[in-house]
From Swiss-Prot:
It comes from the Bacteria. It holds the Pfam family SfsA_N. Belongs to the SfsA family. HAMAP family: SfsA. This is Sugar fermentation stimulation protein homolog. The lineage of its organism: Bacteria, Bacillati, Cyanobacteriota, Cyanophyceae, Synechococcales. It comes from Synechococcus sp. (strain CC9605). InterPro entries: SfsA, SfsA_C, SfsA_N.
Length: 254
């Protein structure tokens, strides 16, 4: 893995996104956006959840333009501007396809070496769980110098909902998320199990389970942490051409 990155460093860079204004989001996967040119385009919305607190018609948004014969839509909705907990507006990453890639880059940059130790290998979407019917987001192999040689199972959760300066997950009932917690507990004690909330906005100081949205998830979350599942909230900020590392955040169990 590469050298350590400091808060504010760019972990991912990309071609500058195109800014516009959100007109509406509909059919879960679609969003109409008016570009600065006055043109209205339809963008793919990878986030099919309720997007609580970050879906605001009339807000500024950023889109990625990537035409392809394999894609029905050339535009993808990547970021949204929202009122932040600090009273300032901030940009939120809303593309649920990004967090796994982002957390992988975070590990590769050495940002989590203090928590995870040195890592020799990263594999994605490895089968595990009951009858190996699930896939873990990232499976890490410790380097030889890592004092804990157990494999590390990382489950990543994109997190955009907030209550003040606390990030919350989930923002709706998620039976899939409940199952992931149970399966993380299942790899203990022969492996390390780490839940990584990907805090896709820079204005948060802590993470907590979204008890009001999914009480059962909150119960399982506390059971998991009591059983030895580690929780490692990772915070990021977003610009028009990069995602920046902002460090880890505290876990608040209330």
């Amino acid at each position: 893995m590469t050298g350590l990155s400091s808060p504010g460093d760019a972990l991912l860079r990309f071609e500058p996104l195109t800014e516009g204004v959100l007109l509406k989001r509909y059919k879960r996967f679609l969003a109409d956006v008016e570009l600065s040119s006055g043109e209205t385009v339809t963008a793919h919305c990878a986030n099919t959840g309720p997007m609580t607190g970050v879906l605001i018609p009339g807000q500024r948004v950023r889109l990625r333009y990537a035409p392809s014969p394999k894609r029905k839509l050339a535009w993808t909705w990547e970021q949204a501007e929202v009122p932040g907990a600090d009273g300032q507006h901030c940009w939120v990453g809303i593309n649920t396809a990004l967090p796994n890639r982002l957390i992988r880059a975070t590990v590769e940059a050495g940002c989590l070496e203090a928590q995870l130790g040195a890592i020799a290998r990263i594999r994605a979407e490895v089968a595990y769980g009951t009858n190996k019917r699930s896939r873990i987001d990232l499976l890490l192999t410790p380097a030889e110098q890592n004092p804990d040689q157990r494999p590390i199972y990382l489950e990543v959760k994109n997190t955009t909902w907030t209550d003040g300066s606390t990030a919350l997950f989930p923002d709706t009932v998620t039976e899939r998320g409940q199952k992931h917690l149970i399966e993380l507990m299942g790899v203990l004690p022969d492996a390390r199990a780490v839940l990584v909330p990907c805090l896709s906005r820079p204005d948060v100081t802590a993470f907590a389970p979204g008890d009001s949205a999914d009480p059962r998830y909150g119960e399982l979350f506390r059971q998991a942490t009591n059983s030895g599942v580690e929780v490692l909230p990772c915070c990021f900020s977003f610009s028009a051409d990069a995602v920046h590392w902002q460090g880890t955040r505290l876990v608040d169990l209330g």
